[in-house]
Every structure is written in structure tokens, then in C-alpha cells.
């Protein structure tokens, strides 16, 4: 608790919504703002060292050897837009999502499917109480077929905490030649996530929950499927 500024006898447990700010994160943010006071003191390496350090830490967290496959983004929707910008669909193909999935991982796919006149498949939560998560996992696997181009989902559902077996889902996507895109916002930082076991084609995580970062920041991992791709915007520093 001493790492946070939480007054009184409060116990904060709702990081699934938003984590409290760590003292050292707040300090780093203030320090970053202060550097603009004296731009003449900035060195060329200052544009890259801090970012590289963050990328290395995130890579270590997900057991990724090549930290250069990590990119920083302002949001999950931005990271997902970079994914959808580099996927072409046939009208006969589909994209599989979870029912009531968070909009950041829905709207980009809606636009992509509309653009290519393809199909968007939502796997809805079963209307049962016992073994609901088990059945939901089974339904996801059943919806993945030879027409599936992409499965995009979280390891943990944001609305009710259902856990999905991404290793089994990854195996099924490989069998049909589909991509697996993961929104790790609800799990990475709170639960183990091994990139070498799950092997997603892309992983996007907002930092303001279990990663204990500030709002308006996200980490993205892009696998080989997106090598030589096109970002949604071009700048001198984003390649």
C-alpha cells in the first residue's frame, strides 16, 4: 500500500476497472513533463531510451525475447486499428468475436467486415449458470471453421470475468489457418501470459488496469503475420 497514495484505511480492489496510480509512475510522469522546461538539455537518445525500457519490461512480462516487436500506442482501439489495417477479407470469410465484447475490440472489426462485405460472428454467452464458462469456451471452438479469417478476443471477459483457454483456441485457429488477436487488458499483469505458449498473431493491452500505467497508453505485440505491414499513420518515429 505504501507504493500508492491511498488515504485512510481504504482497500482498493477494482483494478479490473482502473488501477490507482503508483507513486513511481506519477513521479515519472511529472519528470517527463518537466523535461519540456529545458529543451536545450534534451539529447537524441532521450527520444528512445525511455520507450525502449518500457518495451523491454513488457516483453519480459509476456516472455517475449524480441522486445522490438513491442509497440506503444494510445489505446486498444488504436492498436486494433493497426491490425485491421493490415488484414484483407474475402466476402466468404468471417471474423469471430465474443458476445458483449468491449467496443475497442469490436468497432475496428465491424468496419473491416463492412468494407469487405464479410461476416461478423458473435459467440454469445450461454444462458446457464453451471459450467457457463466451460460451455462458452466450447461454443467459441465450434464457431471457428474454414471460413474464419480472424478470432479476436480477450483471455478474460471484461463484463463477467469468464476465462478463455487461449491455447486451445490458438490450436483451433491454426488448424483452419485463422489469425488469433488478443486484447489482454483484463488479464495481462494480473495473470500469467506466455507469448510462446499462446502464440497470438497480435496482443494489445491498455496500460491503465493491471499494468498499473497511466490512462491513454497501451502496449502492442505484433507477430510475423504483420511484418512489413502499414501503420494507420506515418511519422518519423513510429517505424
Segments predicted by a language model, with ranges:
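Pyridoxal 5′-phosphate
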Residues: 1-239
